Amino acid sequence: FFVRRNTAKGLKKMEYNGLPEKQGLYDPQFEHDACGIGFIANIKGKTSHGIINQAIQILKNLAHRGGVGSEPDTGDGAGILIQMPHAFMKKVCKNEGIKLPKKGDYGVGMLFLSPDKDTREESLERLTKIIDGEKQKLLGIREVPVYDVCIGNSAREAMPHIVQVFIGKGDESLDADSFERKLYIIGKLAEKEIRKSGLDNYFYFASLSARTVVYKGMLTPDQVNEF
């Protein structure tokens, strides 16, 4: 938009700022950009891989809401939030020797850690103490397989080590909302302690919940499924 501005001599000139002037209920100070967001679900709550595929397609259709730099294969970030895939988690955890309780009695933390092995081991030790301090159970830790060949050099150089942390209820009588709050507290305490100490600047929970899991990264929408 081009808007008129008064000059010192009372003359008018045209100036470009991209937004219309404040008028009526409109105020340009409240303008802001947002990421592209899509939502799809089965109204009967039925889970399926088909829903995930459709969500990935939505993500790809929103590629114009993302951005890339000089490397066309390094994006500014993309991801997907899904309902807890209990059957899948149970299957992959069995291969890792991790025994999961029934759905809702455990949470999954999608955790970013330092690429340095010693640093992330110390970070996980501190996280374990925090979980114990909140009287919950660490059930196990799973390495998340990634296919980093599909991403750009800049994204690969900045990529954290990714694991899934499985946390069980310390008290089986704990209701779903209370357990969700416990997981939230664990995540915030861990991020505050570990990042504030300067031990691991990579330490970050993309999600920590008994209900949902987030897969995301410095990706383009087309890379999420492959990565």
Residue ranges and their predicted role:
Residues 1-13:
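Short, Lys/Arg-enriched N-terminal segments with co-localized hydrophobic residues
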Residues 10-227:
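N-terminal segments that mediate ammonia production and transfer
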